[in-house]
């Protein structure tokens, strides 16, 4: 798959998440809002995988779509990939949008009640009942990271 079509797939995932969150704010019933937010989380996680696929292809990394494996592959090639380094820092910060995405996605996947899915010591921006505010924050943060990565990649 070419770089432009990889970018297109990532863009489609992020746009789908944005549209699902918009629909969620227009809903009157809680179950539908929760369903749309869960669907948006899936699209966001898929968008993150899309970004990882773009990086993997751009840097010719042989690893699977796993942040740690991609970092190891980059280190083995003797290269530093700024977007992977940034994601690693975010992953290690329990308060980051990336950690929130992983927690919320896993909770949705496991059909857990949102408020019970978060770790007791983790303070999140929002928890499921915030009308998608935290999910919108994740969307804007991921979108910003994708755009910065592409801008940096275009300079080289």
Segments the model singles out, each with a brief description of its role:
Residues 36-57:
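Short, hydrophobic, well-ordered secondary-structure elements
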């Amino acid at each position: 798959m070419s770089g432009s079509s990889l970018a297109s797939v990532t863009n489609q995932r992020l746009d789908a998440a944005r549209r699902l969150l918009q629909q969620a704010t227009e809903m009157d019933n809680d179950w539908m809002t929760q369903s749309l937010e869960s669907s948006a989380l899936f699209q966001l996680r898929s968008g993150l995988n899309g970004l990882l696929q773009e990086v993997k292809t751009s840097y010719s990394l042989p690893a699977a779509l796993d942040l740690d494996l991609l970092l190891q592959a980059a280190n083995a090639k003797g290269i530093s990939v700024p977007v992977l380094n940034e994601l690693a820092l975010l992953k290690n910060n329990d308060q980051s949008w990336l950690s929130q995405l992983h927690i919320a996605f896993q909770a949705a996947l496991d059909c857990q009640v949102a408020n019970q899915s978060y770790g007791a010591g983790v303070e999140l921006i929002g928890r499921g009942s915030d009308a998608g505010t935290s999910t919108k924050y994740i969307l804007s943060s991921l979108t910003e990271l994708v755009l910065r990565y592409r801008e940096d990649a275009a300079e080289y």
